């Protein structure tokens, strides 16, 4: 009920493909779209080089090795689950983009040598978060990027999940409607066959929600709420060896722990702290 009220009262509409892939304003400008309900506006005078979201999450920026050298990548398993007709797939670099024998998407870039630059980056690198105004060389301008806290798309997912618990068919209809109206180019998405139960439907909805809000800090809370497992270790994984962590149910490291330095100075905190999750999940080694 309240998700639908938020959709109607906000007057917001989901991002279009053009807005999503905009090389100058993609996920960095509240004024360039009608999807953001709530966000953070960061003026240039508040930007301190590396101390901003863009420096770490924008692969196209030229001033921060955290972004353009470390390169935040999507899990290959998650990427491979994205429908080929889904334009959100263009948020990450396809492993086949350099193969002349295979058809590849013409990725948009704020860099003059965009295609050549993208070919140098690791497979699955994200290009979702662009430097503000496309200013990839100037951290004062490019780093002054707005950041979304809440997009109207989240309300559509909340509504579909809630409705499915009352009427599974209605939840399926709502997810199909969202995907075909706003994400799948040409339509044709149908989750009916993979939604024989509320649990199966929720798994599919969460898959689409993970794709939708990748890097925005939204889905971890859903996965904790639903006690969902993580899978980073598998044949063909692109996760670094020490990060190939598989869990049964919610990950213990999703609970924030106050650091040792603080507990040493304030012993009372140690009695009220969350358990230290260090080494509770061993990396998968094949």
Where are these regions (language model features)?
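Acidic/polar-rich alpha-helix caps and helix-coil junctions
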Residues: 1-54, 79-286
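Short, cationic low-complexity segments
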Residues: 58-76
């Amino acid at each position: 009920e309240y998700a639908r009220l938020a959709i109607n009262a906000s007057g917001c509409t989901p991002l279009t493909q053009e807005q999503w892939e905009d090389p100058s304003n993609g996920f960095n400008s509240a004024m360039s779209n009608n999807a953001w309900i709530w966000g953070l506006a960061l003026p240039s005078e508040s930007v301190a080089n590396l101390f901003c979201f863009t420096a770490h999450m924008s692969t196209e920026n030229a001033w921060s090795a955290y972004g353009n050298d470390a390169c935040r990548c999507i899990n290959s398993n998650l990427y491979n689950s994205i429908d080929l007709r889904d334009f959100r797939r263009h948020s990450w670099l396809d492993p086949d983009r350099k193969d002349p024998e295979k058809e590849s998407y013409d990725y948009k870039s704020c860099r003059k040598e965009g295609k050549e630059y993208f070919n140098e980056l690791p497979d699955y690198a994200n290009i979702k978060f662009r430097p503000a105004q496309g200013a990839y060389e100037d951290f004062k301008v490019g780093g002054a990027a707005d950041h979304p806290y809440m997009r109207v798309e989240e309300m559509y997912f909340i509504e579909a999940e809630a409705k499915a618990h009352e009427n599974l068919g209605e939840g399926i209809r709502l997810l199909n409607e969202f995907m075909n109206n706003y994400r799948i180019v040409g339509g044709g998405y149908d989750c009916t066959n993979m939604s024989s139960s509320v649990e199966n439907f929720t798994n599919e909805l969460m898959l689409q929600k993970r794709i939708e809000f990748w890097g925005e800090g939204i889905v971890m809370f859903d996965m904790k709420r639903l006690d969902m497992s993580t899978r980073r270790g598998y044949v063909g994984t692109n996760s670094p060896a020490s990060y190939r962590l598989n869990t049964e149910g919610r990950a213990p490291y999703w609970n924030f722990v106050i650091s040792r330095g603080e507990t040493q100075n304030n012993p009372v905190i140690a009695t009220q702290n969350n358990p230290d999750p260090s080494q509770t999940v061993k990396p998968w080694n094949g």
